[in-house]
Design a protein with these regions (language model features):
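Zinc-dependent deaminase
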Residues: 1-23, 88-180
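Short beta-strand scaffold segments in enzyme catalytic cores
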Residues: 28-37
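A short, polar/charged loop-to-alpha-helix boundary motif
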Residues: 49-60
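Immediate flanking context of iron-sulfur cluster ligation sites
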Residues: 71-83
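Short, basic and Ser/Thr-rich N-terminal targeting/leader segments
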Residues: 24-28, 75
Length: 180
């Protein structure tokens, strides 16, 4: 596949990530592509909305593909994900026997494909996935950075509202005092 092809599929994964952001989830998206270049499964983070800590974009996409093809191994498929997979997702990709992994942003804290760990390329595994990172890196990184910046700002604003409310409530304390 050419870089142009990679950009196309990563853009589709990015669009999935926007779905996660829209529902308040960490914006990570994934698409799985067959050997003919068709997108056959998609996923985005749904851990909060589904009350499922394993509902990362990659896992959601793998589950969708498994249901579609009635199998759990996908040796002729490639996955595009906007963020470097964590340990859980990296192992799921290995067990699924995917051929290629392409990701956007590097995850220096929990990335298991070379950034924080290199679990995916551990020589003990009997299946090797071809890995390429940094596809649409700026866009994918910015989506995550902006999300967390907005989240911090919202928390700050909420904290101020609560402090203001407590302050105002304190000045009316005598109205709420009940003596027995």
């Amino acid at each position: 596949m050419s870089i142009r092809d990679h950009s196309y599929y990563m853009t589709k994964a990015y669009q999935e990530a926007l779905k996660a952001k829209k529902i308040g989830e960490i914006p990570v998206g994934a698409v799985i592509v067959n050997k003919d270049g068709d997108i056959v499964a998609t996923g985005y983070n749904q851990t909060i909305s589904s009350n499922d800590s394993s509902a990362h974009a990659e896992i959601v996409a793998l589950r969708a593909l498994g249901q579609r093809v009635s199998n759990y191994r996908f040796p002729d498929y490639s996955i595009y994900v906007t963020l470097e997979p964590c340990c859980m997702c990296a192992m799921a990709l290995i067990h699924a026997r995917l051929k290629n992994l392409y990701f956007g942003a590097y995850d220096l804290k929990t990335g298991a494909c070379g950034s924080a760990f290199n679990l995916i390329s551990d020589p003990k595994h009997n299946h090797k996935i071809i890995v390429e990172g940094g596809i649409l890196k700026k866009e994918c990184s910015a989506l995550l950075s902006d999300f967390f910046k907005e989240r911090r700002q919202s928390k700050k604003e909420l904290k101020k509202i609560i402090q203001d409310f407590k302050s105002k409530l304190g000045s009316y304390k005598h109205f709420f005092s009940i003596s027995f």
